[in-house]
Amino acid sequence: MTPHPILVPDTSVLLKWVLDSEAEEDRDRALELREDWLAGRCEIVLPSLWFFEVGNILGMKQPALAKQLMQVLLDYRIDEAPPAEFCRKALELMKTYKVTFYDAAYHALAITRSGRMITADHGYFRKTSRAGHVEVLKNWSSQSLRGRI
């Protein structure tokens, strides 16, 4: 049995887990990713800064529901990587591709763990795809996981 693939969903994907809206493009794929993780077909790990970015967006987009939605995500108890594991690589990605540290942190973690960052941010993907280890949510499929276990 091969090890489970490591996926690093960024904030754009995590928000689709809790924002129940028709406007959330590719929400079905984000939910499929979550279900694969819950079924044990993959591992999910996040940079320890994830909740700052998610909390900020929830507080701005859904102030009345922000606490409740954040608690849903916290209750998943997703594995978190300490900053020392991804900081240097994130800074390299920032410099090379002119992206934010927040976005680069997810990507750097995917690189250091030999996994894949999954993002719904097409702009980030276009800028950084040459670095590898990043996939746009729209193209992600759980079929790639089922063949590995």
Where are these regions (language model features)?
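Acidic catalytic patch
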Residues: 68-96
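Short, well-structured N-terminal submotif of metal-dependent ribonuclease cores
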Residues: 1-46, 58-68, 140-148
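Short beta-strand scaffold positions
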Residues: 9, 45-46, 101-104, 119
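Acidic, PIN/NYN-like endoribonuclease modules and their adjacent C-terminal/linker elements
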Residues: 1-6, 51, 76-80, 107-149
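A general alpha-helix detector
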Residues: 13-14, 53-57, 72, 89
